[in-house]
Amino acid sequence: MRLIPLHNATDVGLWSARHIVKRINAFKPTAERPFVLGLPTGSTPLQTYKRLIEIYQAGEVSFRHVVTFNMDEYVGLAESHPESYHSFMYNNFFNHIDIHKENINLLNGNAPDVDAECRRYEEKISSYGKINLFMGGVGNDGHIAFNEPASSLASRTRIKTLTEDTRIANSRFFNGDISLVPKYALTVGVGTLLDAEEVMILVTGHAKSLALQAAVEGSVNHMWTISALQLHPKSVVVCDQPATMELKVKTVNYFRELEAENMKDL
């Protein structure tokens, strides 16, 4: 596992955006051989999307031959709802780049058969071989995507019941009213994430510090699904200084020295 300990959330957004651009450009995608990118929603990746849009507008990257798969979607929320993840992705990213609509893959939380929808999603991912880079965030309780504590580390795309803690955290997007937050979501599984060629997780803020500690210094534990990154041969965690508050000083210093060359020019 790589840990990139940066100063603040703005730096996390810039570093992660540059990393995605480097991976896409090095891959040299074509229509027949697209770059497959996994994407999250939430407040943490907003800086990354902002930077990616800026880099695209500067002519330094194209998304014409990029295929995307999003991590999750609420069940029962209309696609047009302002807090649906469909709306989030189009408003904050897709509407501002040159990606082809047919290359955008999002789970349908209103599918008449959600189990069939989850199987379809897994099959669509498999049809591309693998996801080249899956970017994600993490919850305060260490969940990645909507793989809540005690999720199987071998899980695939499925419907999940959201914990009260997650619904309380997400109520800030629903005028602070937890009753408006859906109780269920469709989500890729931990196993789905681990199948990706590379996984990059963004961790910002003191509230995520226990989750980061579990990921980096803890043991692999299904109560902290982020800890499954330890099983991945090519995982990278990009964090800010407040998120490192529960890590040992020597741990942070070790990774800071190790990644010094990769943290220049921010």
UniProtKB/Swiss-Prot annotation:
**What is the main EC category here?**
hydrolase
Disulfide bridges in this chain: none
Q: How is its activity regulated?
A: Allosterically activated by N-acetylglucosamine 6-phosphate (GlcNAc6P).
Q: Pfam families, alphabetically?
A: Glucosamine_iso
Alphabetical GO biological process terms: carbohydrate metabolic process; glucosamine catabolic process; N-acetylglucosamine catabolic process; N-acetylneuraminate catabolic process
The protein's site described by Part of the allosteric site is found at S151, R158, K160, T161, Y254
Show the InterPro entries listed in the entry.
Glc/Gal-6P_isomerase, Glucosamine6P_isomerase, Glucosamine6P_isomerase_CS, NagB/RpiA_transferase-like
Pathway where it operates: Amino-sugar metabolism; N-acetylneuraminate degradation; D-fructose 6-phosphate from N-acetylneuraminate: step 5/5
What CDD domains does its record include?
GlcN6P_deaminase
Gene3D superfamilies, per database record: 3.40.50.1360
Chemical reaction(s) catalysed:
alpha-D-glucosamine 6-phosphate + H2O = beta-D-fructose 6-phosphate + NH4(+)
Give the family, as the similarity comment puts it.
Answer: Belongs to the glucosamine/galactosamine-6-phosphate isomerase family. NagB subfamily.
Q: How does it assemble?
A: Homohexamer.
The record's section on HAMAP family has:
GlcN6P_deamin
Q: What is this protein called?
A: Glucosamine-6-phosphate deaminase
Species of the source: Edwardsiella ictaluri (strain 93-146)
Question: Gene for this protein?
Answer: nagB
